[in-house]
């Protein structure tokens, strides 16, 4: 069975998120655990935690179908020590917030190496590979430190694949596999596949053959046992453009066939499938449209 929803607002308090999800007919949702544009937030109050859990029950949504997202400020691979420490502390705080809310996942973008290498440098590819590998190791170290700091918790660190825009890592399945390999406690790690990011990173999804090829590569390199959520987005940019711009379903370069393949793929059962499409007013329709694709 599929559990589709969207990244809903936590305006007025995170406890409102389940009700916002219910209002659009969602069976899953994503939410920012705290304000995504601030480093520090006041601790969660007990009444907020209780209200969140109560509203989750009211909405009929299970904690495992909630996919919280961390702050966009966090870069677990930051090359500057001070900013890296700040990112690590904020990430640990968000893991603790998820645990307080009774949730078992925290979705995050791996990080960016921020190294500027001129394209015309004759050693461009060697220097790029070196910068990426070093950054991946720093991210893995950040993950291990975060897991160690939250030992009593079972919140999983869910790595999101990226479009590879700028110096963002996570645009190759090999990046995800590298991080998983370096994480000591593999019971605390997972992956979220974003369809727009997958497509603009160069993995096609538009035909049956292309979809199967991409998912076979994911299984071979990462493994479906690590898939803990998906972001369901169409893409404004073309295949392999390495640009991250979401589009409403059927209004981008990916098209409906790919979403039909996902909705009929048993490997995507029982995980949150989250819309992050650009027009929130279409979310109720998009959720219905996705369920309508399921072949009886």
UniProtKB/Swiss-Prot annotation:
- Write down the CDD domains for this protein, in alphabetical order: AP2Ec
Q: What class of enzyme is it?
A: hydrolase
- Which cofactors does the annotated protein need, by name? Zn(2+)
Give GO terms: molecular function aspect only: deoxyribonuclease IV (phage-T4-induced) activity; DNA binding; DNA-(apurinic or apyrimidinic site) endonuclease activity; phosphoric diester hydrolase activity; zinc ion binding
Name the positions where Zn(2+) 2 binds. 160, 194, 231, 276
Keywords, comma-separated and alphabetical: DNA damage, DNA repair, Endonuclease, Hydrolase, Metal-binding, Nuclease, Zinc
- Which amino acids does the record list as binding Zn(2+) 3? 197, 244, 246
- For the ligand (Zn(2+) 1), the binding residues are 69, 109, 160
Taxonomically, which superkingdom?
Bacteria
Q: What is written in the cofactor note of this entry?
A: Binds 3 Zn(2+) ions.
Checking InterPro entries in the record gives: AP_endonuc_2, AP_endonuc_F2_Zn_BS, Xyl_isomerase-like_sf, Xyl_isomerase-like_TIM-brl
**EC numbers, comma separated:** 3.1.21.2
Q: What is the protein's known function?
A: Endonuclease IV plays a role in DNA repair. It cleaves phosphodiester bonds at apurinic or apyrimidinic (AP) sites, generating a 3'-hydroxyl group and a 5'-terminal sugar phosphate.
The UniProt family comment states:
Belongs to the AP endonuclease 2 family.
Recorded protein name is: Probable endonuclease 4
Name the source organism: Sulfurovum sp. (strain NBC37-1)
């Amino acid at each position: 069975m599929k559990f589709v929803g969207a990244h809903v607002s936590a305006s007025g308090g995170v406890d409102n998120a389940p009700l916002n999800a219910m209002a659009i007919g969602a069976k899953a949702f994503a939410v920012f655990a705290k304000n995504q544009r601030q480093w520090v937030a006041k601790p969660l109050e007990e009444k907020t935690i209780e209200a969140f859990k109560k509203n989750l029950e009211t909405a009929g949504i299970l904690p495992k179908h909630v996919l919280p997202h961390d702050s966009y400020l966090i870069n677990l691979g930051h090359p500057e020590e001070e900013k890296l420490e700040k990112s690590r502390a904020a990430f640990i705080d968000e893991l603790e917030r998820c645990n307080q809310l009774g949730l078992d996942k925290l979705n995050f973008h791996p990080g960016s190496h921020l190294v500027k290498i001129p394209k015309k440098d004759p050693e461009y590819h060697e220097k790029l590979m070196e910068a990426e590998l070093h950054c991946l190791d720093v991210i893995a170290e950040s993950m291990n430190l975060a897991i160690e700091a939250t030992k009593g918790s079972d919140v999983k660190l869910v790595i999101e694949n990226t479009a590879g825009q700028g110096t963002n890592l996570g645009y190759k399945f090999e990046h995800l596999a590298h991080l998983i390999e370096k994480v000591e406690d593999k019971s605390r790690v997972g992956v979220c596949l974003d369809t727009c990011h997958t497509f603009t990173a160069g993995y096609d999804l538009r035909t049956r053959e292309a979809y199967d090829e991409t998912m076979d590569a994911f299984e071979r390199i990462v493994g479906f046992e690590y898939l803990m959520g998906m972001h369901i987005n169409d893409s404004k940019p073309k295949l392999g453009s390495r640009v991250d711009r979401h589009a409403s379903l059927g209004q981008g370069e990916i098209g409906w066939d790919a979403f039909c393949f996902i909705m009929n793929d048993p490997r995507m059962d029982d995980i949150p499938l989250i819309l992050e499409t650009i027009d929130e007013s279409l979310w109720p329709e998009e959720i219905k449209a996705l369920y309508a694709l399921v072949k009886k």
